[in-house]
Amino acid sequence: MSDGFKALKLYNTLTRRDEEFVPLDPANVRMYVCGPTVYDFAHIGNARPVIVFDVLFRLLRQLYGDDHVTYVRNITDVDDKINARALRDFGEDITAGRLTLNEAIRRVTERTAAQFHADVAALGCLAPTHEPRATEFVLPRTDGKADMASLIQTLIDRGHAYAAKGEILFDTASMPDYGQLSKRRLEDQQAGARVAVDPHKRNPSDFVLWKESSAEEPGWEGRFTFEGKPLVIRGRPGWHIECSAMSAAYLGEVFDIHGGGLDLIFPHHENEIAQSRCAHGTPVMANYWLHNGFVQVEGKKMAKSEGNFVTIHDLLATENFGGRKWPGEVLRLAILMTHYREPLDFSLRKLEEAEAVLDGWYRVVGDAKHQEGDSGAVRRALLDDLGTPAAITVLHDLRAQAARGSEAAKADLKANAVLLGLLTQSQDQWFSGKAADAAIDEAAVEERVAARLSLLRAKNFPEADRIREELSGRGIQLMDYKDPETGERRTKWEVKR
């Protein structure tokens, strides 16, 4: 670790407790995060892990050195959802013979992956060290890196897989401690199965490693051997085996951190662990498992049927949410204002609050250079399980000092914010195109001023200060004075450019 700061502590889903982070090799800290399945544009729920683990990547780079952290985030470009999207979007072309299904699939995945890259760049995320695509790791490779077919063969040879009905499946009963991540006991799953189990499965929890493709579906020539007898199945890999192969290809059989959304704990991450441990004969796949919480939109589960399905592209490039486009930095801060393990209620109000805060920070930071500041305060907050809310409180305090004219605080504000991936633009870039006066709703400002006065009379000073900060972030300066006739506190306001 680069200095004398306290140790990094992370909540490990595997053990259900906070643990001090001790890398296997401080000279090469290794992290794998599940990336997108590129059949549709990434939504706001997908944005959360991208941003959260970007912050962790930035922190690890600062602690161990930029060249000593390897971050792998995959792209899943083989999946039945992709096949279905290709048929939906290019069905007429396929029927008319203008495109093959494989060509249509390639168009879907290339278009969607390109949009994903544009989205995450706008969110201020650093590029991962490696971004492998699943289709590049299906069959044995000339460079000797791990691949899916070889991993499946190893599982067969070690007695963890069987063939049935055109599929190769993982035998969960062959792994005594299957379910350790999700805390689901195999016996309970077998006893509690309430849906019909595929008759070709030995156990309800068994899952597909390789499945047969029809003549029309994409597929690879999978060549396997069972007890000396060859078995050739033209097919495609199961979802879980993809991440086991790609993580091993770049990070080895055991690595430091595996991350993703809470929804991936079971079955995806559980099954990754099963495959990897049984194939490699290791006690763990990764030492630390981190999961971000769920995202709701305006208090409801996000769903197209609810009409609240919001993509990152919608927010950045259309006026579908709140009647306007939103800067990526606003979206980033709105997500970081909630601790990564807590549920996040994404709302118009949260975006407005985040933008007001950023306006306030950019107003005071001026042309300060982050290289001249000290980012230690935010680093200390992040060392406690990526405590971004505490880190943002640090930035509020620095903004207050900077507003009083402290040049050192301006540089520190910039340096600390950059560690979170914020304040990465110049002041002019941020405010270009913003018509501050035109954006002011005078009635709304008067309402907030009146609310603040009520809070002051009730001696609720923290909430009153919060409103002042909110308005200040929008370029509105409050000036308190006494009414000369009644002696009561009054407030006037003006817009400061």
Curated annotation (Swiss-Prot):
<keyword id="KW-0648">Protein biosynthesis</keyword>
<keyword id="KW-0030">Aminoacyl-tRNA synthetase</keyword>
<keyword id="KW-0479">Metal-binding</keyword>
<feature type="binding site">
    <location>
        <position position="304"/>
    </location>
    <ligand>
        <name>ATP</name>
    </ligand>
</feature>
<dbReference type="GO" id="GO:0005524">
    <property type="term" value="F:ATP binding"/>
</dbReference>
<feature type="short sequence motif" description="'KMSKS' region">
    <location>
        <begin position="301"/>
        <end position="305"/>
    </location>
</feature>
<dbReference type="InterPro" id="IPR014729">
    <property type="entry name" value="Rossmann-like_a/b/a_fold"/>
</dbReference>
<dbReference type="InterPro" id="IPR009080">
    <property type="entry name" value="tRNAsynth_Ia_anticodon-bd"/>
</dbReference>
<dbReference type="InterPro" id="IPR032678">
    <property type="entry name" value="tRNA-synt_1_cat_dom"/>
</dbReference>
<dbReference type="InterPro" id="IPR024909">
    <property type="entry name" value="Cys-tRNA/MSH_ligase"/>
</dbReference>
<dbReference type="GO" id="GO:0008270">
    <property type="term" value="F:zinc ion binding"/>
</dbReference>
<keyword id="KW-0436">Ligase</keyword>
<dbReference type="Pfam" id="PF01406">
    <property type="entry name" value="tRNA-synt_1e"/>
</dbReference>
<feature type="binding site">
    <location>
        <position position="34"/>
    </location>
    <ligand>
        <name>Zn(2+)</name>
    </ligand>
</feature>
<comment type="similarity">
    <text>Belongs to the class-I aminoacyl-tRNA synthetase family.</text>
</comment>
<keyword id="KW-0862">Zinc</keyword>
<feature type="binding site">
    <location>
        <position position="272"/>
    </location>
    <ligand>
        <name>Zn(2+)</name>
    </ligand>
</feature>
<feature type="region of interest" description="Disordered">
    <location>
        <begin position="478"/>
        <end position="497"/>
    </location>
</feature>
<keyword id="KW-0067">ATP-binding</keyword>
<keyword id="KW-0547">Nucleotide-binding</keyword>
<dbReference type="InterPro" id="IPR015803">
    <property type="entry name" value="Cys-tRNA-ligase"/>
</dbReference>
<keyword id="KW-0963">Cytoplasm</keyword>
<dbReference type="GO" id="GO:0005829">
    <property type="term" value="C:cytosol"/>
</dbReference>
<comment type="subunit">
    <text>Monomer.</text>
</comment>
<dbReference type="GO" id="GO:0006423">
    <property type="term" value="P:cysteinyl-tRNA aminoacylation"/>
</dbReference>
<protein>
    <recommendedName>
        <fullName>Cysteine--tRNA ligase</fullName>
        <ecNumber>6.1.1.16</ecNumber>
    </recommendedName>
</protein>
<feature type="binding site">
    <location>
        <position position="268"/>
    </location>
    <ligand>
        <name>Zn(2+)</name>
    </ligand>
</feature>
<dbReference type="Pfam" id="PF09190">
    <property type="entry name" value="DALR_2"/>
</dbReference>
<feature type="binding site">
    <location>
        <position position="243"/>
    </location>
    <ligand>
        <name>Zn(2+)</name>
    </ligand>
</feature>
<feature type="short sequence motif" description="'HIGH' region">
    <location>
        <begin position="36"/>
        <end position="46"/>
    </location>
</feature>
<dbReference type="InterPro" id="IPR015273">
    <property type="entry name" value="Cys-tRNA-synt_Ia_DALR"/>
</dbReference>
<feature type="compositionally biased region" description="Basic and acidic residues">
    <location>
        <begin position="480"/>
        <end position="497"/>
    </location>
</feature>
<dbReference type="GO" id="GO:0004817">
    <property type="term" value="F:cysteine-tRNA ligase activity"/>
</dbReference>
